[in-house]
Each structure stands twice: as C-alpha cells, then as structure tokens.
Amino acid sequence: MVKPLPRLRLQGFNNLTKALSFNIYDVCYARTEEERQRYIEYIDEEYNADRLTQILTDVAEIIGANILNVARQDYDPQGASVTILISEEPVIDKKLAGKELISDAVVAHMDKSHITVHTYPETHPQEGIATFRADIDVATCGVISPLKALNYLIESLESDIVIMDYRVRGFTRDVKGKKHFIDHKINSIQNFLAKNIKSRYEMFDVNVYQENIFHTKMHLKDFDLDQYLFEEKAKNLSFKERMKIEALLKREIEELFHGRNLSE
C-alpha cells in the first residue's frame, strides 16, 4: 500500500508525475531451431495485443484511472505494443454534456498519464537460448500511484527477471506556496512488493533518494530446469546435457540481471 504523507491542502492541481518502468524477462531453452521457432510463436500468441490490452486495462482499474484511448498493434514477424491514455478524472461524454467541454483535468493528463507495453521475443542463433522481454511503463500525473499495480504486473507475466525503475518528477504547491516534490513515503520499491513475491526473488537496490529515483532488480531464487525447458523434460536428458543447459541458462540469467556480458 502506498503510504501518503500528512494530508496537504494544495493550490490547484497535483502536478507530480510518477513513472514506473519494468523490464520483465522470461528465459527458455529450446534444443532445435524448430523448437525455438515454436517458442517464438507460442510467446507471440500468449502475449498478443489483445492479451496485453486486457492486462493494461486491469492495471488502469487497479490504480483507479479512467481510460481515454487505447492503441494496439501486433507486429510481423513477432512482438506487440499497446498504449493506453489515462486520467484520474471521469471522462465527460460530449453528447450527454451538451456544450460542456471535457474537463481541464482530463486535458492536462493526456500528454502525461499513460500505460504502455512493448514485447521483444528473440533467440540465440546457436546455443538454444530463447528470451522474451516485456517493457512496461506506467506514468501518472496527480494523486494516482502506479505502484499499486506492481504486484499484479509481476504475476501477470512469466517473470524470471524483473528490472524496475520508479521516479517522481515535478512539484505540487500547497496553499501557503510551499513546493512539495513527493507526496508519499518510499525508500525502496521493495516496500510495495507482496510478501509472497519477495520470498521468491533475490533482490538488489540502487536508489538515489535525494533525486527521488528508485531502482530494484530481481531474479527468481530457485532454479528448476524443467521450468526453463521448452517441449522437453529434464529427466529425458543425460547428466552431461543437463549440466550444459543449466550452465547456459544461469549465465543468461546473470547477464540479463546485471545488464552486461560476463567474461568467459
């Protein structure tokens, strides 16, 4: 739960912009080129634009936002994108409102409050590794907090590795003219993760408190080879094959987690 600071009387609108960004990775091993192609096809169908639209629609509901517009696209040969414009105020139906215009709050939000997702399936040309990355951004302006959707997004995708960034920008002014650069308590994104998620992941923080920048990355603690094999079972592999595949997968996970290639 997002813990607010003591209630402030504001001069006008809350102009704080809060942005939460995810890079979520699913890692897989597919032995043959045909299996790798089927993995790409599976991921492409599992996370097509329709499914992603439903996930982002759920996010909007969770954070208490109103949907203004939805744009979505499936790409050839693979990948999908969805962008949803949101506001914290109800949208006025112009037909029902007569000559009344859409409220200033809605107009103010349209360039700042949005939820987007882009997917990137890919495979290694030789070693059998296949990965799926989903980039998700939830940006809000006002009292709505994107942190409320944190746990839902992690659970909605096959999240072997999760890289998260949260930042607060701008300021809001109280009735005495004092500027406030953040309106809730936070010292880590981990504060907002559910206990069952924290128990499953190894986590690492890099935070710049004075700049209202918070970074958390995490990967699953337990390694079960069967969870990473596509159309295959570990029991059907020789010991030597299992060790080789496990080493490849663990190296891939480490490199994605640290964001760099590791030395041989």
Swiss-Prot record:
Protein species of origin: Stenotrophomonas maltophilia (strain K279a)
Pfam families reported in the protein's UniProt record: AdoMet_dc
This protein's UniProt keywords: Autocatalytic cleavage, Decarboxylase, Lyase, Polyamine biosynthesis, Pyruvate, S-adenosyl-L-methionine, Schiff base, Spermidine biosynthesis, Zymogen
Coiled-coil annotated spans: none
Pathway the protein contributes to: Amine and polyamine biosynthesis; S-adenosylmethioninamine biosynthesis; S-adenosylmethioninamine from S-adenosyl-L-methionine: step 1/1
Co-factor(s): pyruvate
GO process annotations (BP): spermidine biosynthetic process
Swiss-Prot/TrEMBL catalytic activity: S-adenosyl-L-methionine + H(+) = S-adenosyl 3-(methylsulfanyl)propylamine + CO2
Protein family membership: Belongs to the prokaryotic AdoMetDC family. Type 2 subfamily.
UniProt GO cellular component terms: cytosol
Location of the active site: 113 (schiff-base intermediate with substrate), 118 (proton acceptor), 141 (proton donor)
Site (described: Cleavage (non-hydrolytic)): 112-113
Post-translational modification: Is synthesized initially as an inactive proenzyme. Formation of the active enzyme involves a self-maturation process in which the active site pyruvoyl group is generated from an internal serine residue via an autocatalytic post-translational modification. Two non-identical subunits are generated from the proenzyme in this reaction, and the pyruvate is formed at the N-terminus of the alpha chain, which is derived from the carboxyl end of the proenzyme.
Protein name: S-adenosylmethionine decarboxylase proenzyme
Residues the record lists as Pyruvic acid (Ser) modifications: 113
GO molecular function: adenosylmethionine decarboxylase activity
